[in-house]
Amino acid sequence: MTALPLLLALHSCSDCFGMALLDPQQPGADPLVQVHPDGRGLSNSLISRVQALLPPERWSQLQGLAVATGPGGFTGTRLTVVMARTLAQQLDCPLLGVSSYALMAPRLERQLPQSMQGEPFWITQELPRRGVVGGQYRITAGQVHELSLPTLLPQGASPQPAVEVQLDVEADVAQLLKLLQRSHAAGAAMPWAEVLPIYPTSPVGQV
């Protein structure tokens, strides 16, 4: 039987920081999932959180990394994307980037009427004083297709059908790890340089 790879997924697109680890050294090799309500303190706790889950002396054994690329808080998203890119570059390790909306799409689609499932739908989020951010998705045969990356929609736009963003970092970081495991098994290249954070609005406000 082929040995399981050592894989790590990071998600910080909300006030909670999520990590998921597939570690072949763990009994049963079930994924380890942790969620910490670090909020703005993530800038001080990020590295120590990762080190506590996976000691630095084992980082060179990583065979794949994944990170949620946003939308989310500017600082939190940027921190984990930068850390994941740096690790992937230094370790020559594949890096998968997935938007936070794409991660929640499978569970949000279940809120739609049965007749609409399998068809394109929108995930939207209203931001105070900014507007509505939306991305379009379609799920076929268990695969999430991101038809439109999350972006700030034109004022007054109301795409349908639409489901409001609902945060569940524990479920979504576990989904991210599952996607990483699937991509690793398929031999996907996953170059780190292509993974960038998604900022639908300017972090410095209106210009």
Specify the residue positions occupied by each region the protein language model found.
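Short, well-ordered alpha-helices that flank and scaffold nucleotide-derived cofactor binding pockets
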Residues: A52, R85, Q89, R110-Q111, ...
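Phosphate/pyrophosphate-binding loops at sites that engage ATP/ADP/AMP, CoA/4′-phosphopantetheine
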Residues: V50-G64, L112-P113
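Catalytic-core segment of enzymes that process non-peptidic bonds
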Residues: Q34
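Short, conserved active-site loops that position catalytic residues or coordinate cofactors/metal ions
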Residues: S48-R49, L79
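DPxDG-like acidic metal-binding loop motif
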Residues: G64-S100
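Oxyanion-binding and handling regions
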Residues: M1-D30, G39-S45, L96-V207
